[in-house]
Amino acid sequence: MKNIKFIKPFFVEEIDENPISGKFIIKPLERGYGITVGNALRRVLLSSLPGTAIVNVKIQGVEQEFTTIPGVYEDVMTIILNLKKIVFAVDDESDDFEEKLELIAKGPQRLTASSFELPAGVKIINPDHYITTLSDDVCFHMTVTLKKGIGYVGAKDNKVHGENQVGVIAIDSLFTPVVNVSYQVEKKLGNKDELTIEITTNGALLAKEALATAASILVDHFNVLVELSQKPAHVEFVSESKKEAHNSVLDLEIEQLDLSVRLFNSLKRAGIDTVAALVKLSEKEVVKLKSLGRKSFQELKDKFLEYGLEFNDYLKEVLHHSVEEDKDKH
């Protein structure tokens, strides 16, 4: 079968990243691939990334969650709800990771996530997160079990980790470290897509780490499908260089630029039908075109920048070569 050539993204721009969020621009993509790639990444980011969470809790003197503890401000159910919101990050990459954390305190005291005794390799991202408050002379001893997992796991499924011990309360666990994902697709020159994806995490990992992990998960799944056939149709991915991207833009007709009627008519009356013909003009020559004012000229410059073509820099380069060619002719 004849080789099929697809454009492969050569540019991924990371903007506005902080410890809990990041925005990424991926381009160029074949027409329609912005939605295809964006939707696949979003689904995996929200459902399939591994994380660490509390799976059960044991509080000294407590046998079940529907009770109160003398000298403790919150009831057991509220304490459990507060525990679910603690964000953990661990260095251990093994799937069977398990760690027990203890919190031993005496009142009066306000307990937060930082009140836990942490072993090496375990970090709490939100140490100021509130758990409960103890009154005078109250002793409080709590043990929680940390496990790794994916997505959401209900308390019923977490009971296996409690080993049927009396007083061990299984709780719901939200393992996924990604809080929100949104994306948008813009159409660019050359009938290409530009994908912008924004990721917010709980702080357990950076947005770029989440994006890379999601992409890796997708690749691993697709590789299994590729292996179904020993002789798949060969698909060649072509990574366009910036020079090639410029060349593809230069071949476009001005009708494809989605210009205002006034600007379009001005260029047409001047006999300018393609982007290649347009960039051969100097800025002064463009401004002097009939019925084309500075507002239209600014629109033209903005349009070039919008589609990733540095109009001024490229124009100077073209003019320089044109001058050199004229000198050679004379």
Swiss-Prot record:
Name the EC number(s).
Answer: 2.7.7.6
User: Which reactions appear under catalytic activity for this entry?
Assistant: RNA(n) + a ribonucleoside 5'-triphosphate = RNA(n+1) + diphosphate
What GO biological process terms are annotated to this protein in UniProt? DNA-templated transcription
- The lineage's top-level taxon is Bacteria
| One function term, GO molecular function aspect | DNA binding
Sorted alphabetically, the Gene Ontology cellular component annotations on this record are: cytoplasm; DNA-directed RNA polymerase complex
The annotated region (Alpha C-terminal domain (alpha-CTD)) lies at 245-330
Keyword terms of this UniProt record: DNA-directed RNA polymerase, Nucleotidyltransferase, Transcription, Transferase
One Pfam family from the record: RNA_pol_L
Q: Which residues form a coiled coil?
A: none
Instruction: List the InterPro entries hit by this protein, alphabetically.
Output: DNA-dir_RNA_pol_insert (IPR011262), DNA-dir_RNA_pol_RpoA/D/Rpb3 (IPR011263), DNA-dir_RpoA (IPR011773), RBP11-like (IPR036603), RNAP_asu_C (IPR011260), RNApol_insert_sf (IPR036643)
Q: How does it assemble?
A: Homodimer. The RNAP catalytic core consists of 2 alpha, 1 beta, 1 beta' and 1 omega subunit. When a sigma factor is associated with the core the holoenzyme is formed, which can initiate transcription.
Family per UniProt?
Belongs to the RNA polymerase alpha chain family.
Query: What does the UniProt entry state concerning the protein's domains?
Result: The N-terminal domain is essential for RNAP assembly and basal transcription, whereas the C-terminal domain is involved in interaction with transcriptional regulators and with upstream promoter elements.
Summary of the function given for this chain in its UniProt record: DNA-dependent RNA polymerase catalyzes the transcription of DNA into RNA using the four ribonucleoside triphosphates as substrates.
Q: Indicate what this protein is called per its UniProt record.
A: DNA-directed RNA polymerase subunit alpha
**Protein's gene:** rpoA
